[in-house]
């Protein structure tokens, strides 16, 4: 189980790049999601705690300050740590230029995780968007 808050955007205004949704979750120990595939990119940023992200047979241990990318139609699984469960935020996006944006972040199918040097700024932006859900 998790406590989560989500902003869902139903109609994209731009074809080249658009936000689909964003949110954050504070997970309970061993809370998991998947295996599941999604139609768009989703970037997760770990705000605190630890967990694992799995794509196929590859597992990525993650901790505070790191990010992981879910690619469109990729079957993934992720799970909070038993003793130090994570809290994370996510941003789902798509569009004709989304793949270029992902590459500009230094991510691709072979590099799905990274240290996130602008994590606090990303957190502020997502939380500001979530304040406008009511």
Annotate the PLM regions:
Residues 13-16, 37, 92, 116-123:
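Alpha-helix N-cap/helix-start motif at coil-to-helix transitions, marked by capping-box chemistry
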Residues 18, 42-45, 94-97, 121-125:
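Amphipathic, well-ordered alpha-helical segments in soluble domains
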Residues 45, 79, 91-94, 117, ...:
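Alpha-helix boundary/capping detector
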Residues 70, 90, 114:
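Small/polar loops that bind or transfer phosphate-bearing groups
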Residues 101-134:
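Amphipathic alpha-helical segments enriched in hydrophobic/aromatic residues interleaved with Lys/Arg
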């Amino acid at each position: 189980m998790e406590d989560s808050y989500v902003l869902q955007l139903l109609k994209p205004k731009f074809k080249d790049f658009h936000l689909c949704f964003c949110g954050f979750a504070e997970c309970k120990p061993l809370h998991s999601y998947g295996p599941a595939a999604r139609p768009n990119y989703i970037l997760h940023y770990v705000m605190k705690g630890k967990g694992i992200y799995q794509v196929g047979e590859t597992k990525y241990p993650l901790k505070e300050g790191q990010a992981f990318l879910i690619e469109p139609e990729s079957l993934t699984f992720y799970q909070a740590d038993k003793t130090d469960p994570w809290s994370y935020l996510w941003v789902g996006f798509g569009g004709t230029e989304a793949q270029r944006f992902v590459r500009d972040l230094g991510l691709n199918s072979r590099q799905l995780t990274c240290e996130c040097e602008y994590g606090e700024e990303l957190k502020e932006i997502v939380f500001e968007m979530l304040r406008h859900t009511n």
